[in-house]
Every structure is written in structure tokens, then in C-alpha cells.
Curated annotation (Swiss-Prot):
Record PTM text: Hydroxylated on second and third proline and last tyrosine residues (to L-DOPA = 3',4'-dihydroxyphenylalanine) of the tandem repeats.
Organism encoding this protein: Mytilus edulis (Blue mussel)
Tissues expressed in: Produced by the byssal gland.
Modified residues ((3R,4S)-3,4-dihydroxyproline): 92, 118, 148, 158, 178, 188, 198, 214, 224, 240, 250, 260, 288, 298, 308, 318, 328, 338, 354, 364, 374, 390, 400, 410, 426, 436, 446, 462, 472, 482, 522, 542, 552, 562, 572, 582, 598, 608, 618, 628, 638, 648, 658, 668, 678, 704, 714, 724, 740, 756, 766, 776, 816, 836, 866
Protein name: Adhesive plaque matrix protein
Region (Disordered) residue spans: 80-267, 279-537, 556-820
Gene name of this polypeptide: FP1
Amino acid sequence: TKHEPVYKPVKTSYSAPYKPPTYQPLKKKVDYRPTKSYPPTYGSKTNYLPLAKKLSSYKPIKTTYNAKTNYPPVYKPKMTYPPTYKPKPSYPPTYKSKPTYKPKITYPPTYKAKPSYPSSYKPKKTYPPTYKPKLTYPPTYKPKPSYPPTYKPKPSYPPSYKTKKTYPSSYKAKPSYPPTYKAKPSYPPTYKAKPSYPPTYKAKPTYKAKPTYPSTYKAKPSYPPTYKAKPTYKAKPSYPPTYKAKPSYPPTYKAKPSYPPTYKAKPTYKAKPTYKAKPTYKAKPSYPPTYKAKPSYPPTYKAKPSYPPTYKAKPSYPPTYKAKPSYPPTYKAKPSYPPTYKAKPTYKAKPTYPSTYKAKPSYPPTYKAKPSYPPTYKAKPTYKAKPSYPPTYKAKPSYPPTYKAKPSYPPTYKAKPTYKAKPTYPSTYKAKPSYPPSYKAKPSYPPTYKAKPTYKAKPTYPSTYKAKPSYPASYKAKPSYPPTYKSKSSYPSSYKPKKTYPPTYKPKLTYKPTYKPKPSYPPSYKPKTTYPPTYKPKISYPPTYKAKPSYPATYKAKPSYPPTYKAKPSYPPTYKAKPSYPPTYKAKPSYKAKPTYPSTYKAKPSYPPTYKAKPSYPPTYKAKPSYPPTYKAKPTYPSTYKAKPSYPPTYKPKISYPPTYKAKPSYPPTYKAKPSYPPTYKAKPTYKAKPTNPSTYKAKPSYPPTYKAKPSYPPTYKAKPSYPPTYKAKPTYKAKPTYPSTYKAKPTYKAKPTYPPTYKAKPSYPPTYKPKPSYPPTYKSKSIYPSSYKPKKTYPPTYKPKLTYPPTYKPKPSYPPSYKPKITYPSTYKLKPSYPPTYKSKTSYPPTYNKKISYPSSYKAKTSYPPAYKPTNRY
């Protein structure tokens, strides 16, 4: 070809590092056309200068080292690398690689090798044939059930189930209420609410001329032009006939609170005389723009304080009122059901379980779980010991280091302010605190007043109602447990919980001096605190509740296992493990070559000068191994002791449960769940299922005749579960269900229903969650993990795990009794002694050492690797 003369190698055309003999075979004319596949100047420096000048648009690749890389296929270039490069030799196909550090031992066919793994490898355990693994997912995992393109599943419901309509994503559902409910209308954002008043009230226009009123009317003040109307995003509700309306004021209005009849008011800013109303309407005097008018009211009037423009009023309702909750714009409503319906929550339901159930809470993605333990387990605290308390103990939550605690006081305690000193008053005095500018004032009311909430509407319920706390949208619900449950806190590290106080505690708040004062209240008034939007409330629990400690985000919890669980220890990086052997094993040191001897010969190995010899012992000797200085040993325990393993920092423990536990996995927010099916359903897995049709077909499971398929929806669809006939519905986002008149409401943020003891809850998930089907006990699921996922398994009580080791661990294999290997070792090897056939190693360890499990000789370890993992010789 026209480039052949240019490409022909010439000795004088190469730079100094070139070794001409390497190129000698090319001088024979072979059927090689270099220009067909290789640009002649690629990667070279001076070899093909004439052609490089022709290829004007070609820019030769500059490298950090002078690599000649572009030779014909038969040429194996010798690369020059930077000083830090550690070359890995390449061998012909028949080459049997010799390890660079530790020899590769050949074993008889019955030897079951224990592989070594890279540091990032998370082993997948092997289980008995009847084991049903519970799957966990990494935070980024988004499993989605795969259906054939034409699959239109139909959900199956119990006979009494009333189907829920599915709505577009922008649909805002309106719950149904009992007959006594007086609806609070919702308005568009631009709606200017006109409050409804009792029958005797004569409304007054806001800006139009004031009409004349009956003699009993006390005028509503007029405001200067700078008045900012009370925002109308929250509609003003309608009130019962006995309600006395509260006027709204401009933002700069300084409220003068109303006091009980015995209170002698001290004026706060400017004393305002009260006016006696004449039978005819008296015009309101006009004041300068900065005047803060205080209206006068009839004696029975209950004053309504002024609020900042951002204040969201909470209406008060009669005792039988069933509140209609307000929802964020993204709320996907769940319809309300008849009282006998037991709904399955779809967002953050956390059911209660029978007293024997140890719940596995769901946590934020960064949370490292702290396991729950069986009742007989005596926990060794891993972060901060949380003592157990008598049933009447009110738990004091644990906080991150940066938390500034607000102490709780006994009922008679008079708080000492933390900002400005406040004088002490007689016991009947109710102080009027000062607040920072951003504070949303809360009015004081007579004892019979029904408060209007200041953050999100919280209806009032009869005295028997048990309130459900409300949470911000980003809150991950904490389950409620039976009294015997020892809970774990799942707060993020930045969480500042709010303490709860005894009912009689009167907190005295201190605020910045610029605060617009908050009125004082009659003794029987229980003020409701208002919180900024970012406030994360702390739930108060019944007296028998055992609080869950909260840990920083970096905390790695240590799981506990059922009493029969045999722990899998973890070792420090420098630990040289000593494997456990079958009773008849003839151990072999793995340092210096040991010749083969007659079968009765017990070899005494030879060691390097630095070796601390470990002798061989008679059969009855219980050896005490020695460990490197950094080794953290674990003491030996009686045979009945169930060890609790410790794990390296990167270990994400999987909690294991008693055999009867039906686990419900917790998922990250982005998890797409698989639908659940009736117990008789034989599901076909939905992630890596082998198709039965052409490759584009996603296997469609076969169902029993009674199965009503659950549809697959577009990505934006928020699935609604099917429920048993007696299920009580739980709202999906911020829905407030309707209750019987005896029901005590919980706050409106995230409802947490309680269920009968036999109820197996289906966890609720974020809106993007696609449900995963639950299968009957005999179902053998196929893994649905991405290739990079390394699951952590739980084990049945009788499972003996196979050990995994840190990267630097040098495992020593175990052999059948008749095997006498002969090995040569590098000079730095640490020898392991050999023992007589009946040797039972009784190891005494330092306190933190985690015992290594020995397995029966019939145990066959099966190690599975992720698809991309190529195990390398790490010796």
C-alpha cells in the first residue's frame, strides 16, 4: 500500500529506548496491512514523521511517559510507566500463575476453599433450602415490577371493599365527614374570605362606608391606608352560634390581651379608655396613620389578638366537629371509608404489633440501624447506654452534641428566663412574655374558649380521643409499639426535639426585646405552642413507652440476633486469623516448606528468626493463641453463650428476628415497591426474571383463578393498596380521617393508626414508591437487585455463618485428615502451628475479640460474587 514504505521499521528511525530485536519478526513479509487498522503515527514519537506531516489534522496523543504503543498486532510493546506504576505481568494462556506473595496451595478434591475478598466485597450468605431471605435495598435502588406491555392488572379486593378512585396527580381530595360536620370551605388563592358570624351579628364592610348598627353593636375599627389585610389563603371558618368573632388587625398592631374578670390590667403601650356604646351608632374617630386602635367590645366579647401576615389561623369547632385537614399542594388524597374499613396506609403508616413483635422501624437513608433484640438479650450499649425504666418513667430523649436542652420542670417550678431577667411574681400572676419579631402571637382565651390553631388546623375532639401527632412533610414516621417494646430513636443528627412537660407545667418563655407581647391567660388555659415551619416536633408517648435513643448519622449500629444465632466476628485489619478445623484435621503450617512424612509423623516446623513459635500440643492441650498487638480479642464464653458480633465501620447490619417474624422491609424514599398479592399467589420475580417469550417480553406471572391482578401504573402514579374488610383507613399524606364522636384526634401531619394484635402491617412509602408484592411462605423469590448491589441477609436460628475477613486477612484453609501438603513460603510469613488430630482449640481472647465460628465438616460454603467482581489472588 502507499503507506507501506513509511511504516517499514528502520533501526535508525527509533528513539533510544527502542529495542530492535523486538521488531525482528516484522522484517519478514507477512500478510499485514498496517494502514487498514492502525494510523501509523498514533502514539509514536518519531517513527513515521513523513506521514505525520501529511495528516495535518492529526494531533498525536501526548502521554505522561514516552510509550510506543502503536505497533502491528503481533508486537507486544514494552511500555514505560511512571515511577509509581506496579506492572502486572501478562502470561500466555497456558501459564499457571504463581502468586506474588503467598503460594497457591493445591488441595485434594474434597477441600472447600474459602476465598479472600476485596475490601469492598459484601459477601452473600448461603442458607438452608427453606430459608426465606428478607431483602434490603441500597438508597439509590429503584425496583419496579416489570409487566408485559399489554398487561392491564386488576386489583383484587375483599368482597366488602369499596374501590378507591384514582385521580390525576393534581387532584386534591375532599374527605367525607359525619352528618354533624360543618364544612370549612376551601377557596382559590385570590379569594378574600368573608367570615361568617353568629345570627345576631351584623357584618361590616372592610373598606366601604360603615352602616348604622343596632345599639348592641360594638364597631369594628377602621384602619389606616397602610393596613395589610389578614391573609386570605386560609379561609375563615364558620362558627357555632355562641362564637364571638375576633377582629383582624394590621401587622403593626400591638394586641392588648383580654384577662379573667379578677385581673387588674397593666397597660402595655398606651392606655385606651373604653367607650360606652350609645343606642345609636357612634362614628369612630380618625387617628394619625401610626395610631394603633383598640376596639371596645360588649362585656361578653372574646378578643381576637392580631397576628403577623403569615399567621395561619386555627378555627375552633364544637365538640362534635370532625376537622377537614389542609393539605400541601402535592397531596394525593385517599378517600375516607366506612367505619368498619381497615385501610392500608400508603405513605407512612406504622402499625402496632402484638406484644411479641419486635418492629423494624424505617429510617432516613443515612440512618445506620440499631437492631432490636429478643426479650432475653442483655444489650451491650454501642453508643450511649439507655437504661430501662419503670413503666411510669417519662423518657428523656437523647440529643446530638450540639443540642441546647430546654429543661423540664416540676409543676410548681417558676422558670428563670434565659435572655432577660424577669422579676418573680405572686403565684397568681401569669407573666406576659416578650417574643422575637418572628413570633406568631397566640391569644389568651377564657376557660371555655375553643382555640384556633396557629400552624395547621387541628380540630378539637371529645375527651376520649387519642391524638395523633402531626409531622412536617419530610418526617419519617416513628412506629408506635406495644408497651414491652424497647424502641430505638430514628432522628437525624440535626434534630432538636422539643421536650414535653407535665400537664401542670407553666413554661415561662423568654424572647428578644423587640417582640410584640403575648397576652396572659386565665389559670385554666393550656396554651398551644406555635412552631416555625422547620420545627420537628417530638412525640410524647404513654408512660410505658421505652424511648429510642437517637444517634448521629455516622453511627453504625450493632444488630442482635435470636438466642440460637451464632455470630460472625469481624477482625481488625492486622489480624491473622486461625481457621477452625474438623476434629480429624491435621493442620499444616503455611510458612516454610515442610517435607512429607509418614502418616504418624507430627512435623515441627522451622520458623524465621522473628517468629514467636507456637508449639504443638498433646491431644488434651487447649492452646492459647497469640495475636498481633493491635488485635482486639473476645473472651470465650460458656457453651450456652450467644455471642454478639462486632462489625467493621462500613458494616451495615441486618436485623434478624425470631422465626415467627414476618418482616416488612423499610425502603429509602426513592424505592419503587412491588405489588402485594393474596397468600395463594405464586409470583414470578419482577427484576431479573428470565423471559419466557422473546427478549423484549417481561414475564407475566400466572395467578390462581381468584386473583384480581394489581395494575402497573405510569411512573407518576401513586399506588393505593387493597385492604381487608375491617381495616381502618389511614391518610396518605396529611389526610385527617373521620372519626366517631368518641374518637380522639391525632395531629394532622402523619397519622399513625393502631391495628388489632394480629394485624400484619404493610409499610407505607414515599409518593414515588412502587409497591413490591408480598408472597406466600413457599415462594422462592428471585433476586431483583442491580448488579452493584450487595445485600445483607438475615439468618434462621440454626444458621452458622461463613466468615468474611478484612482485606489484609490471610486465611489458612482446612484440609481432610489424610492431606499432607508441602509448601514453600516467603520470608515474612507468620507461621500457624499444626495440631494433633483431636486438638480442640480453646482460645482465650482479649475482651473485645469476636469469636470465630467453626463449621461442621459437611458445611459447604457457597460464595456468590457480584457480576463485575473478579476475585484476584490477594496473597
